[in-house]
Curated annotation (Swiss-Prot):
One cellular component (GO) term of this entry: chromosome
Entry-linked SUPFAM superfamilies: SAM/Pointed domain
Record domain SAMD1-like winged helix (WH): where: 23-99
Organism for this UniProt entry: Homo sapiens (Human)
Biased composition (Low complexity): 12-29, 115-125, 140-158, 168-177, 237-247
Lineage start: Eukaryota, Metazoa, Chordata, Craniata, Vertebrata
Sequence positions bearing Phosphoserine: 161, 261
Gene Ontology MF term list: chromatin binding; DNA binding; low-density lipoprotein particle binding
Free-text function comment from the UniProt entry: Unmethylated CpG islands (CGIs)-binding protein which localizes to H3K4me3-decorated CGIs, where it acts as a transcriptional repressor. Tethers L3MBTL3 to chromatin and interacts with the KDM1A histone demethylase complex to modulate H3K4me2 and H3K4me3 levels at CGIs. Plays a role in atherogenesis by binding with LDL on cell surface and promoting LDL oxidation which leads to the formation of foam cell.
Name assigned to this protein: Sterile alpha motif domain-containing protein 1
Induction text: Expression is inhibited by miRNA MIR378C.
Domain description: Winged-helix (WH) domain directly recognizes and binds unmethylated CpG-containing DNA via simultaneous interactions with both the major and the minor groove of DNA.
Record note on quaternary structure: Homopolymerize into a closed pentameric ring. Interacts (via SAM domain) with L3MBTL3 (via SAM domain); the interaction mediates L3MBTL3 binding to chromatin. Interacts (via WH domain) with KDM1A; the interaction modulates KDM1A function.
CDD domains named among the record's database cross-references: SAM_Atherin-like
Length: 538
């Protein structure tokens, strides 16, 4: 049949559902598997698994009629293996095993897809645990021997002989659990089983009230003993639901165990628990605060090692952490001082006769990186004839051909300083006539009258702004900014190939072709006779 299968009216569906429910109370494993797989595949394709889609897909894949699929789906809903969800007036279905666990309790019980291959009786027995209601069923309550009140009573009445056996494994578990602080969200996931987790604190507390005695190995549990007895009286439904087997610890229990208010003031989030865990670890010296306020593992500490003594350890590691932080700060301050000295010594005076033009350009534009804002302001403010004296970097007497470079010209994008010698900048000895000066990347110092020199005839010596000016004069002002953003100076321009212009500059293809052709014409006019015109400029 070409169209989608005609679904029966609700009355017929209800009758079919009740008849099927009367005949067999549990859905057959085949149908359960088919329906759950269909729901999962629809959700994975972001399609809403409503009744019509589920019936159509089950029929296409496996062949049963929509009425039968509906009946089986109703059974699965009764078994709580499938959840019916109403969203914006339309009803869809979800696989209960993939739904997030309820927020208040621990993780949900075993997923309901387990009885897939099991007989119908096992499937029928599965329903009660899944909804996770606060009042637990009687058999589950009976099967939970580790309930908090019973544990407290047992701890109060128990003789001290079984006591030492309990804290041993717990201490071994708790030490690695508290030791690696970078994963504070781990306690809920890596939780020990419910029995030994809840029972020992009162037993240990009742057995050894004084904290100091060193022979006791479990240092972390002892330090945290006073808070745990508080949560014992009010048992939560979540504590009972797990049936006494391994139950992950809820965030609320972790907060109470660390002595915080158990989420009384608003929602309990992982962030709050993480903050409590970090504070606890920092207070006990397992973490140290950096200068920026973050928490980091002390350098000497390894996560696996247990602390030697309970009382001596926190104060010692706290002191050690402060000393380490102080040492770090001193080292960083020393490094900064050295960097500043290097900046001044490198940028102060440049013997021009010893350096080629490229080296002059890179001396301040290269590896040193942008300078601090204070230094930039100092270097920008002076202009006019007193520039060298105001900067405090005037030439030494008898310095021969040394020349003072103004640091005023700053490249707008990069923020790095480039060497500039305008006609304003004083030079004790006049420049050699044949040596062209490098114009500043931006032209003139801020607030100073424009006194740029003309663009050098040799493009090797062009700066970024010379290249921008060249293309602006050629009639491509918008595209010239692309050359400025990429910081293409004369040398880079000479090395560019055709593909670099067309694809590497984020210029649209039409203008890029025009720019390239304009430049080829310039080449043909004999601007650069010696260069090979295959490249962009050579």
């Amino acid at each position: 049949m070409a169209g989608p299968p005609a679904l029966p009216p609700p009355e017929t569906a209800a009758a079919a559902t009740t008849a099927a429910a009367a005949s067999s109370s549990a859905a057959s494993p085949h149908y359960q598997e088919w329906i759950l797989d269909t729901i999962d595949s629809l959700r994975s394709r972001k399609a809403r698994p409503d009744l019509e889609r589920i019936c159509r897909m089950v029929r296409r894949r496996h062949g049963p009629e929509p009425e039968r699929t509906r009946a089986e789906l109703e059974k699965l809903i009764q078994q709580r293996a499938v959840l019916r969800v109403s969203y914006k007036g339309s009803i869809s279905y979800r696989n209960a095993a993939r739904v997030q666990p309820p927020r208040r309790g621990a993780t949900p019980p075993a997923p309901p897809r387990a009885p897939r291959g099991a007989p119908a009786a096992a499937a029928a027995a599965a329903p009660p645990p899944t909804p996770a209601p606060p009042p637990p069923p009687a058999p589950v309550a009976a099967a939970a021997p580790a309930r908090a009140p019973r544990a407290a009573a047992a701890a109060a009445t128990a003789p001290p002989s079984p006591g030492p056996a309990q804290p041993g494994p717990r201490a071994q578990r708790a030490a690695p659990l508290a030791a690696p602080p970078p994963a504070p969200a781990a306690p809920p996931a890596v939780a020990p089983p419910a029995g030994p987790r809840r029972a020992p604190p009162p037993a240990v507390a009742a057995r050894e009230p004084p904290l100091p005695p060193p022979p006791q190995p479990p240092a972390p549990p002892q330090q945290q003993q006073p808070p745990p007895p508080q949560p014992q009286p009010p048992p939560e439904g979540g504590a009972v639901r797990a049936g006494g087997a391994a139950r992950p610890v809820s965030l609320r229990e972790v907060v109470r165990y660390l002595g915080g208010s158990g989420g009384a003031g608003g929602r309990l989030t992982r962030g709050r628990v993480q903050g409590l865990l970090e504070e606890e670890a920092a207070a006990r010296g397992r973490l140290e605060r950096t200068r920026l306020g973050a928490l980091a593992l002390p350098r000497g500490d390894r996560p696996g090692r247990a602390p030697p003594a309970a009382s001596a350890r926190p104060s010692r590691s706290k002191r050690g952490g402060e000393e380490r932080v102080l040492e770090k700060e001193e080292e960083e301050d020393d490094d900064e001082d050295e960097d500043e000295e290097d900046d001044v010594s490198e940028g102060s005076e440049v013997p021009e006769s010893d350096r080629p033009a490229g080296a002059q350009h890179h001396q301040l534009n290269g590896e040193r990186g942008p300078q601090s804002a204070k230094e930039r302001v100092k270097e920008w403010t002076p202009c006019g004839p007193h520039q060298g004296q105001d900067e405090g970097r005037g030439p030494a007497p008898g310095s021969g051909t040394r020349q003072v470079f103004s640091m005023a010209a700053m490249n707008k994008e990069g923020g790095t300083a480039s060497v500039a010698t305008g006609p304003d900048s004083p030079s004790p000895v006049p420049l050699p006539p044949g040596k062209p000066a490098l114009p500043g990347a931006d032209g003139t110092p801020f607030g100073c009258p424009p006194g740029r020199k003309e663009k050098p005839s040799d493009p090797v010596e062009w700066t970024v702004m010379d290249v921008v000016e060249y293309f602006t004069e050629a009639g491509f002002p918008e595209q010239a900014t692309a050359f400025q953003e990429q910081e293409i100076d004369g040398k880079s321009l000479l090395l560019m190939q055709r593909t670099d212009v067309l694809t590497g500059l984020s210029i649209r293809l039409g203008p890029a072709l025009k720019i390239y052709e304009h430049h080829i014409k310039v080449l043909q006019q004999g601007h650069f006779e010696d260069d090979d015109p295959d490249g962009f400029l050579g």
